[in-house]
Amino acid sequence: MEYVLTATKTKARAGSYYDRIARLYDLTFKVNGYGRSLDQYFAAHPLPVTRGAKILDAGCGTGLLTHALLRAIRFPVSITALDLSQTSVVAARKSLYYSPGRKRDVTFTQGNLLCLPFADESLDLVVTSGALEYVPLADGINELARVIAPGGHLLHLPIHPSLIGVFLEILFRFKSHPPREVKDKTERHFRIVHQYRFPRQQAIGWSKTAILAQKV
């Protein structure tokens, strides 16, 4: 496990804002059962990776999705957890001390989703939740597609239109993308394997969907 600083100035304002609210962000998603919902999703939809896979959590925040990946994947993989907010990355790194035995599987990096510090076609899986809403959608998906190997996968958890989605936009200062635009931009590089609506009785179902797509 290591901590690497590779931030760029682009979108620095978003990173600075999250530096200030990292604790609020972490508390919000822990209270609403986000982690449990991810566990249930991964149990029903096993991730398409094998031993030694190279995985990126793009926009990892305080590490909730990173932890869900570690719980879902029982064999050794290499995960990079990247976020623009240094405070969030440090919080995510510290939280992993409560996951003994898996620390070596994760590298924490402060960096920019629009300028990823990875070679072309070098990753097997990219997961992202709550990050593409801060960047032009086409630019974000283009950059994620650049680093995913042919046959690799993208798991995207976009915000879908809802009153809760509007509230989250105001609270966390992002702008969600229309579902049709998300689908169209994704299909420029990927074949959509499935789209999933989280159950409405789960808090995550009020604002998020899941899209798994394979690079063609």
Label each region the model flagged.
Residues 56-58, 62-115:
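Class I SAM-dependent methyltransferase SAM/SAH-binding core
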Residues 191, 198-216:
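Core SAM-dependent methyltransferase catalytic element
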Residues 127:
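A conserved beta-strand element that flanks and buttresses the S-adenosyl-L-methionine
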Residues 152-159:
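Conserved beta-strand signature within the Rossmann-like core of class I S-adenosyl-L-methionine
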